[in-house]
């Protein structure tokens, strides 16, 4: 089934000018980038986006990191896009990520792991709507 999922190329990757390399891995995996923009995430945006982690000890550090440099927000489309992109991203801990995955190739640590991807179709819809209007998604 053709689906859409949401992706963020995080500050550790944009700082190192890896957007093109990450996009190449995404596209090589058969996913299409149907919307993309480089933004500076505001504190309010980051707090809302990661609200599910609000009570976790790393929440403040996560918000600081996500607002520390530009990010690239994206909508990806393809067959089973949510699961496919999670596979392409690799494990949260880059040391445990499979060879050829984005995190194995580019992540620096568990906290600075280069990319975010939606964990479900339901969350993908919510996350996409936080950053894109339907007019900005060109499939």
Curated annotation (Swiss-Prot):
A cellular component term, taken from the record's GO annotations: cytoplasm
Q: What GO molecular function terms would the record report?
A: ATP binding; metal ion binding; nucleoside diphosphate kinase activity
What GO biological process terms does the UniProt entry carry, in alphabetical order?
Answer: CTP biosynthetic process; GTP biosynthetic process; UTP biosynthetic process
Q: Which UniProt keywords apply?
A: ATP-binding, Cytoplasm, Kinase, Magnesium, Metal-binding, Nucleotide metabolism, Nucleotide-binding, Phosphoprotein, Transferase
- Name the InterPro entries on file: NDK-like_dom (IPR034907), NDK-like_dom_sf (IPR036850), Nucleoside_diP_kinase (IPR001564), Nucleoside_diP_kinase_AS (IPR023005)
Show the catalytic activity.
a 2'-deoxyribonucleoside 5'-diphosphate + ATP = a 2'-deoxyribonucleoside 5'-triphosphate + ADP; a ribonucleoside 5'-diphosphate + ATP = a ribonucleoside 5'-triphosphate + ADP
Cofactor list: Mg(2+)
Q: Give me the residues that bind ATP, please.
A: 10, 58, 86, 92, 103, 113
Which locations, inside or outside the cell, does it occupy?
Cytoplasm
SMART domains, from UniProt? Answer: NDK (SM00562)
Q: Which family does it belong to?
A: Belongs to the NDK family.
| Role summary | Major role in the synthesis of nucleoside triphosphates other than ATP. The ATP gamma phosphate is transferred to the NDP beta phosphate via a ping-pong mechanism, using a phosphorylated active-site intermediate.
Subunit-level organization: Homotetramer.
Protein name (record):
Nucleoside diphosphate kinase
Origin species: Phenylobacterium zucineum (strain HLK1)
Query: Gene name?
Result: ndk
């Amino acid at each position: 089934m053709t689906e859409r999922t949401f992706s963020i190329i995080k500050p550790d990757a944009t700082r190192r000018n890896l957007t093109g390399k990450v996009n190449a891995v995404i596209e090589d995996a058969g996913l299409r980038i149907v919307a993309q923009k480089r933004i500076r995430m505001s504190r309010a945006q980051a707090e809302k986006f990661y609200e599910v982690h609000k009570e976790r000890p790393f929440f403040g550090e996560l918000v600081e990191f996500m607002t520390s440099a530009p990010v690239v927000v994206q909508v990806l489309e393809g067959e089973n896009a949510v699961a496919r992109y999670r596979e392409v991203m690799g494990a949260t801990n880059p040391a445990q990520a499979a060879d050829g995955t984005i995190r194995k190739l580019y992540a620096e640590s568990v906290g600075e792991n280069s990319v975010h991807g939606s964990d479900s179709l339901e969350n993908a819809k919510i996350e996409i709507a936080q950053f894109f209007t339907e007019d900005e998604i060109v499939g």
